[in-house]
Amino acid sequence: MLEKIGIMQGRLVPREIKSRIQSFPWTNWKKEIRLAKKYEIKYIEWTLDYKNFLSNPLIQKPLLVKKILKKNNIKLNSITADFFMQKPAWIKQKQKTNIFLIKLLNICNLLNIEFIVIPLVDNSSIKKGNKKKIINYFNLLKKNNHLKKTKILFEVDLPPKKVNSFIGYLDKSFGINYDTGNSAFFGYNFNDEKHYFKRVLNIHIKDRKKGGQTKTLGKGDVDFKLFIKYLLKIKYRNNLILQTYMPKNDNKVTYETLKNLNFIKKTIHEK
């Protein structure tokens, strides 16, 4: 059964940066954890930006974060490292990003956090011809024993066959974070994507039309019934994290997320 259903941080409280659909909720991160408990959401995926990275409570006071999560019965076993997308470590003069990632890996080891999601999209896209640099960078990270028990998962914008090729250069300390909405955006065939699903260890749930923006679940091109049926078939047991549409109207944010949560639970139940 698919039981590890959670939300990306910032999905129960108003956007603090109106121009961005995702950023760390500095003002309301504690409130959001309390709301997650109220609505019986068991998992939250933390998000870390490059700006003010060292001030983020997970970095500055990890044991306090652990205490607050435990008090509210919320599990944190995945983190999205948006800072890596914003300032890729393999680009010249981006040594801070490397330092940040190693610091984050140490905290993950301290708190027993399983996964760090590295978005290889936009500024950090493999399409920019950085494939060899990226592979060498992460293999060196593993060789220098920075990973320990934490696995690094890549969210990529490559066609399915190229995803298989890319992840094949890295061992089982690395995997794939699959994003339903991004797949729909690029118009990829899910049957082709199944070939690398043995390496998928975390899933971001969202809906989009081909070439379009994020929408309420069920309003885009993702066939969620087919998708959930496949996950049940392969006995997928890891996270399903809602990275769903965020309304600009602050009063509708929580309602939208709960509606999407009910949609995905209903789809699972119907199978």
Residue positions per predicted region:
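C-terminal helical cap(s) of enzyme catalytic domains, especially alpha/beta-barrels
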Residues: 250-271
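Active-site acidic/histidine proton-transfer and metal-coordination neighborhood
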Residues: 25-34, 68-72, 86-175, 185, ...
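Conserved, mostly hydrophobic/aromatic
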Residues: 36, 44, 69, 108, ...
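Acidic/histidine-rich catalytic cores of soluble enzymes
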Residues: 19, 43, 79, 138-221
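Gly/Pro-rich active-site loop or hairpin
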Residues: 12-27, 55, 91-92, 182-237, ...
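Active-site beta-loop-alpha junctions enriched in small/polar residues
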Residues: 8-13, 47-49, 81-84, 121-123, ...
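N-terminal pre-domain/capping segments
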Residues: 1-102, 109, 164, 265-271
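Hydrophobic faces of well-ordered beta-strands that scaffold small-molecule active sites
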Residues: 3-10, 44-46, 76-81, 116-118, ...
